[in-house]
């Protein structure tokens, strides 16, 4: 049970940063963040630097506090498009090789 909680942030960050690279979803995500936090973030720069990743995550937290359903919808749509386009590698989502304690 502990493993499930420990692996969640790692999986979430891999899905988040691969999802943010999608062009269509990037525009939706950028407008969502601008609506809720009044910040105009460059997503391509945010994903490539550690400081940018921290800013992106804090902006998404603020956005989720303001409008949770829209934020979740945009992120799930981004993840779906990333999987469909093959941007998320199978090693990140392959649960069959994991050893549970």
Curated annotation (Swiss-Prot):
Cysteines joined through disulfide linkages: none
Residues spanning the signal sequence: 1-19
GO cellular component assignments: plasma membrane
Stored Pfam families: Lipoprotein_3
Keywords attached to this entry: Cell membrane, Lipoprotein, Membrane, Palmitate, Signal
Cell membrane among keywords: yes
Coiled-coil features, chain-numbered ranges: none
InterPro entries: Lipoprotein_3 (IPR001595)
Protein localization: Cell membrane
Lipid-substituted positions (N-palmitoyl cysteine): 20
Lipid-substituted positions (S-diacylglycerol cysteine): 20
Membrane topology: Lipid-anchor
Keyword Acyltransferase part of the UniProt annotation: no
Primary localization: membrane
Recorded family membership: Belongs to the MG439/MG440 family.
Name of the protein: Uncharacterized lipoprotein MPN_650
